[in-house]
């Protein structure tokens, strides 16, 4: 199984220098990062495996789950534009923990232009593939950048029977006043989708020196737009391990939400993810 980005040397990614995490990261490693925090379950989101090894990744994660009790749900990779996409989905769904698919639409303008992912939203084969997910009882994890939100919102509001989870709160990267305004407007557009949740995670990818105070207003704004009933906090580990520990990451989210009710916090830290990923 080949994760191409793990083999790259001296390549700075949009989230920084990956060298410290360019190694195997299995359930025991994740458990060590969790430490004593009361994590009950986890979701594995596909992580850059070579196209031809996508099903092998799913098989491996299922074996990890069988052996260690984590991950409890798998979001697999499938290129929905390919002729064999349905056969690929059939193969993924042979494994019981598979709940959905992620095909990244946007990471960073430079990488997207190089990989061509920023053209997915205009590809009719991509939409055709998305439409088939509902009949398979599969969801879609949507990773993209703010400039792509308007086109993505138009696409996904046309196929609302497909459950969608926005990754990393839409990946805000432009922290200017105009950038924050456009990002929030895009999230409001997304929130009109009746079958969509928003995951809050990944701030370390775009702000390597983040603090509780630097992300507080962003977090609270996302919650305000989607409401606690449609929010799920995530760790984005091991990528966010580059900028903070698991305890510090979750501790920041807990501190920011300390004024919410226990029911609202249960939703954001447990129930929404449990229900969306059918754990």
Question: Locations of the language-model features?
Answer:
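Active-site gating/metal-coordination segments in enzymes
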Residues: 52-147, 154, 197-206, 213
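Conserved, mostly hydrophobic/aromatic
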Residues: 42, 74, 101, 133, ...
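Mid-to-C-terminal alpha-helical segments outside catalytic/metal-binding sites
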Residues: 6-37, 41, 220-221, 225-232, ...
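A generic "structured core" feature
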Residues: 1, 35, 116, 124-125, ...
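Active-site gating loops and adjacent loop-to-helix segments of metal-dependent hydrolytic enzymes
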Residues: 2-43, 95-117, 162-163, 194-197, ...
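Catalytic pocket-lining loop regions of alpha/beta-barrel enzymes
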Residues: 5, 116-232
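Alpha-helical scaffolding within the catalytic cores
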Residues: 22-31, 85-87, 150, 178-187
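Catalytic metal-binding/acid-base residues of hydrolase active sites
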Residues: 48, 79, 170, 203-204, ...
């Amino acid at each position: 199984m080949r994760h191409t980005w793990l083999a790259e040397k001296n390549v700075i990614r949009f989230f920084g220098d990956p060298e410290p995490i360019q190694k195997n990261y299995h359930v025991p490693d994740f458990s060590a990062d969790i430490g004593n925090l009361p994590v009950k379950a986890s979701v594995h989101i596909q992580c850059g495996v070579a196209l031809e090894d996508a099903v092998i990744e799913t098989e491996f994660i299922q074996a990890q789950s069988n052996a260690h009790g984590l991950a409890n749900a798998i979001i697999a990779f499938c290129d929905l534009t390919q002729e064999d996409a349905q056969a690929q989905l059939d193969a993924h769904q042979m494994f019981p923990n598979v709940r959905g698919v992620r095909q990244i639409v946007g990471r960073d303008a430079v990488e997207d232009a190089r990989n061509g992912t920023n053209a997915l939203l205009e590809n009719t084969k991509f939409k055709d593939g998305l439409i088939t997910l509902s009949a398979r009882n599969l969801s879609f994890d949507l990773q993209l950048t703010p400039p792509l939100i308007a086109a993505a919102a138009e696409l996904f509001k046309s196929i609302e029977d497909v459950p969608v989870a926005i990754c990393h709160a839409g990946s805000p990267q432009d922290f200017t006043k105009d950038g924050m305004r456009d990002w929030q407007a895009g999230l409001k557009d997304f929130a009109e989708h009746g079958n969509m949740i928003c995951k809050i995670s990944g701030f370390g990818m775009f702000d390597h020196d983040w603090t509780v105070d630097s992300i507080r207003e962003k977090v609270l704004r996302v919650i305000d737009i989607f409401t606690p009933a449609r929010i799920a906090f995530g760790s984005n580990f091991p990528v966010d391990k580059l900028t903070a520990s698991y305890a510090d990451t979750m501790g920041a989210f807990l501190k920011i939400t300390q004024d919410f009710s226990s029911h609202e916090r249960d939703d954001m830290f447990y129930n929404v993810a449990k229900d969306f990923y059918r754990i």
